[in-house]
């Protein structure tokens, strides 16, 4: 009887636990209920990996390994069975008295560590766990980025490796300042071996866990390699003297700490019994070593990643970490999450087509129960301006249908591609945001105030001291600063300590007064930190240093940016106050400086702002948008020119394309351009091989009206001078005719699907007149001329008769689409004019400024507030004048 009750209760317990995770699919539940030993979760794009991570943590805390177990902590009673049945049937919580019976080896929330790459990704699980487990349990889970986790460890144990617990974290600018000092000391010519190259080499060494001593011992390949090793050692010496770590040090030094101090290592292994790592495919050698050192003897490590989305090789990531996980951790259970909840099936099929051409992968195929959706729209532009106009047209159509600007993202391979889009959007008055532009904390005035705050937190921070000692101007020149640095080095003390006794040094006699005044400022700031709140301290820094007075004086003189810089300092104080509100009693100056040092570009992205988002594909990792524009799909651009010489690099480019494609939820627009200017040079590139890898059934192709006109008239394209086989060259094929009979008796295709090795295939593929074939604008498989809207070469897939998107110029907020027809002459507006915008509605002109034959018009719209736009581009109608 007892045995049967035990079995019945355990079966009911499984059912009860499964109902708690009823929204998960079968594979997700399997990942959640696999609790012990190494676990590899291969999570495809949009497969709900964050949901799995959160639910797995919740299961570890609420139920432990109870699911699937036949063990109970005490003998089961009939009442236990009855109460559990009732809870299952009614969908209510089981009685509190059964809590112990529903758990097995459950852990406390503070025994779990979850590590990922971005603050956003680290914050989301904590928020969801608060909702699932309650505030206290959710808050106790340590969810953090790699770097934040390392800072937390170092704050406690830094003295064990010779650093102060109040260490400073240097950013890129700080590192360059240190390196400049090293170059000066070692008499190294920056032109022979650029500082940036030295810093990059140092970063690679730290990612590979190569110490300065090892770098010096290893025979250098050339003179530059020997120089790099010397500056690495000198650079690290300066950082140690300053009590500072650079960004790469945070992981590198934590690994050294854990590897060399068994007591510290065991402390964390015992504290965090379960370790979960997200985005494992992007980990470096140093990050892998860190994870290994944190993993306890039970090997309760779960890594979540997607080898198909490993895109950070240039930052030191190694895909081998995820590919070799099962070998490194014997007994690993591998679970694949392949059901996608984000995208339409057409978008997923396009992504699968591309990624299956890679060989270095575990292998999986995404699928979805979502609708088939629209086909992927492929647009061939005449140039980058045409590409920008096409994007604006499509967005305008979506807005007409009730869409929002924030639903749209323009993604590109490299930052330089954003310039034409940004320029066009700005002229057209299209609200947009570039993610990855200058960050707030990188503005000069903000960095200056943060530097003041930093030297108060860490008196050894000579780099930040150098930055602000004469900012605002105090008659403390570079010569004086160099003397201070020499005196400090001779005595083994900080520069600030020398300044505090400036009157004791004859070499500083000419600068005694300004130096002692600076020391008085420093003492006032120290007192402020001890007696006032952190945001009040920030305000004091701005005022006591004279920085506010300097900017106010600049504003009075009419300096254009002074008012903006003052506003930025006001925002800085607000940011400090927000930090204090979030951290309560735990708020500290060191903590605030730590937070700003660890902010990434994507952390500043505001999803609630109604703007079109422009960003690199790398920045878009982990994000999703209803409408995605993937631009510049051309050979030499995407994939990049350099990647074509390395199979490993080419596979990384293909993974990057896969990431870009899978950001789209509803519709995906891919564009390539016949002609593109990059870095001041116009280049003509073939369409990307990644386009040709997509099966034709998943796409629709349209082309620029200019290319259509050229095609219909039998003219060659702007490619003609690069094409072997004739002057006319490409004459406007428009379909994805992969199965058509084409040049030289080979199977051809559309313009986008032409082959590379023309000499080997008897023709240059589709789109070009190949060797031995006519270049007059006719298919070798037909005697009829090609015309606009024809089916491409031979009998291939034709372009749609009526393209889905941008079939005609559309009215967008400031869209220049209306300017494509013949101009009706320049528009003229005056202050007080009442105007009607086709999307923004009615508004009043507040200001007008002449600009190169046009006007910049500032309008207060009744619906959307104040906007600026170019008069000749905006779809405005003057209603009346006041």
PLM regions: where:
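C-terminal accessory regions
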Residues: 633-865, 873-882
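Short basic/glycine-enriched coil/helix segment immediately N-terminal to the Walker B
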Residues: 33, 37, 104-109, 256-275, ...
């Amino acid at each position: 009887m007892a045995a049967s009750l035990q079995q019945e209760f355990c079966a009911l317990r499984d059912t009860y636990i499964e109902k708690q995770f009823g929204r998960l699919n079968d594979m997700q539940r399997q990942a959640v209920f696999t609790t012990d030993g190494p676990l590899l979760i291969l999570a495809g794009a949009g497969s709900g990996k964050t949901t799995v991570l959160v639910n797995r943590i919740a299961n570890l805390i609420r139920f432990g390994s109870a699911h699937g177990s036949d063990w109970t902590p005490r003998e089961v009673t009939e009442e236990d069975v009855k109460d559990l049945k009732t809870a299952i049937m009614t969908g209510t919580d089981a009685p509190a008295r059964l809590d112990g019976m529903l758990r097995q080896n459950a852990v406390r929330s503070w025994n779990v560590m979850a590590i990922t790459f971005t603050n956003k990704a680290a914050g989301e699980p904590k928020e969801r766990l608060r909702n699932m487990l309650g505030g206290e349990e959710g808050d106790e889970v340590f969810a953090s980025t790699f770097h934040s986790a390392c800072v937390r460890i170092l704050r406690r144990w830094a003295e064990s490796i010779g650093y102060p617990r109040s260490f400073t974290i240097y950013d890129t600018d700080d590192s360059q300042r240190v390196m400049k000092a090293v170059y000066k000391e070692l008499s190294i010519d920056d032109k022979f071996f650029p500082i940036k190259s030295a810093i990059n080499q140092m970063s690679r060494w730290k990612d590979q866990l190569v110490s300065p001593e090892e770098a010096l011992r290893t025979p250098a390949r050339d003179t530059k390699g020997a120089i790099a090793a010397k500056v690495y050692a000198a650079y690290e010496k300066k950082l140690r003297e300053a009590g500072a770590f650079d960004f790469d040090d945070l992981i590198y030094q934590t690994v050294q700490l854990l590897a060399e101090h068994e007591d510290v290592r065991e402390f964390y292994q015992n504290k965090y019994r379960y370790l979960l790592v997200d985005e494992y495919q992007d980990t470096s050698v140093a990050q892998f070593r860190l994870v290994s050192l944190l993993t306890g003897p039970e090997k309760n490590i779960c890594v979540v990643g997607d080898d198909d989305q490993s895109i950070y090789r240039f930052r030191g990531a190694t895909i081998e970490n995820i590919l070799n996980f099962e070998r490194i951790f014997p007994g690993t259970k591998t679970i694949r999450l392949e059901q996608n909840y984000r995208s339409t099936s057409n978008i997923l099929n396009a992504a699968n087509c591309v990624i299956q051409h890679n060989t270095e992968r575990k292998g999986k195929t995404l699928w979805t129960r979502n609708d088939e959706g629209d086909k992927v729209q492929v647009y061939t532009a005449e140039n980058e301006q045409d590409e920008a106009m096409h994007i604006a047209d499509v967005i305008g159509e979506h807005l007409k249908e009730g869409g929002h600007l924030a639903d749209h993202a323009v993604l590109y391979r490299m930052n330089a591609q954003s310039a034409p889009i940004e320029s066009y959007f700005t002229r057209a008055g299209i609200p947009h945001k570039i993610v990855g532009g200058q960050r707030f904390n990188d503005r000069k005035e903000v960095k200056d105030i943060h530097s003041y705050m930093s030297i108060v937190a860490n008196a050894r921070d000579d780099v930040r001291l150098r930055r602000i000692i004469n900012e605002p101007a105090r008659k403390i020149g570079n010569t004086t600063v160099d003397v201070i640095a020499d005196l400090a080095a001779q005595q083994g003390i900080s520069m600030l300590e020398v300044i505090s006794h400036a009157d004791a040094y004859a070499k500083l006699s000419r600068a005694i007064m300004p130096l002692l005044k600076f020391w008085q400022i420093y003492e006032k700031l120290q007192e402020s930190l001890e007696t006032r709140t952190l945001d009040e301290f920030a305000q004091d820094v701005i005022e006591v240093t004279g920085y506010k007075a300097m900017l106010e004086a600049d504003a009075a003189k009419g300096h254009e940016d002074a008012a903006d810089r003052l506003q930025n300092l006001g925002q800085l104080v607000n940011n400090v106050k927000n930090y204090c509100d979030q951290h309560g009693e735990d708020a500290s100056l060191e903590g605030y400086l730590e937070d700003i040092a660890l902010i990434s570009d994507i952390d500043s992205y505001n999803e609630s702002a109604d703007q079109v988002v422009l960003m690199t594909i790398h920045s878009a990792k982990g994000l999703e948008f209803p409408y995605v524009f993937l631009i510049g799909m051309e050979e030499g651009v995407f994939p990049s020119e350099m990647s074509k010489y390395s199979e490993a690099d080419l596979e990384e480019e293909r993974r990057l394309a896969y990431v870009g494609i899978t950001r789209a939820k509803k519709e995906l627009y891919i564009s390539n351009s016949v002609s593109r200017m990059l870095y001041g040079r116009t280049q003509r590139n073939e369409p990307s091989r990644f386009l040709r890898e997509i099966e034709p059934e998943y796409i629709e192709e349209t082309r620029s009206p200019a290319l259509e006109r050229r095609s219909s008239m039998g003219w060659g394209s702007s490619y003609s001078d690069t094409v072997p086989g004739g002057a006319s060259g490409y004459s406007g094929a428009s379909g994805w005719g992969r199965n058509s009979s084409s040049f030289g008796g080979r199977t051809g295709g559309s313009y986008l699907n032409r082959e590379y090795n023309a000499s080997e295939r008897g023709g240059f593929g589709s789109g070009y007149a190949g060797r031995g074939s006519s270049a007059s604008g006719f298919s070798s498989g037909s005697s009829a001329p090609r015309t606009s809207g024809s089916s491409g070469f031979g009998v291939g897939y034709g372009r749609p008769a009526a393209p889905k998107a941008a079939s005609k110029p559309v009215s967008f907020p400031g869209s220049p689409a209306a300017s494509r027809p013949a101009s009706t002459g320049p528009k003229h507006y005056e202050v007080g004019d009442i105007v009607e915008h086709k999307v923004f509605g009615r508004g009043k002109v507040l200001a007008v400024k002449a600009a190169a034959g046009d006007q910049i018009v500032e309008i207060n719209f009744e619906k959307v507030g104040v906007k600026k736009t170019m008069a000749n581009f905006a779809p405005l109608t003057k209603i009346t004048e006041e």
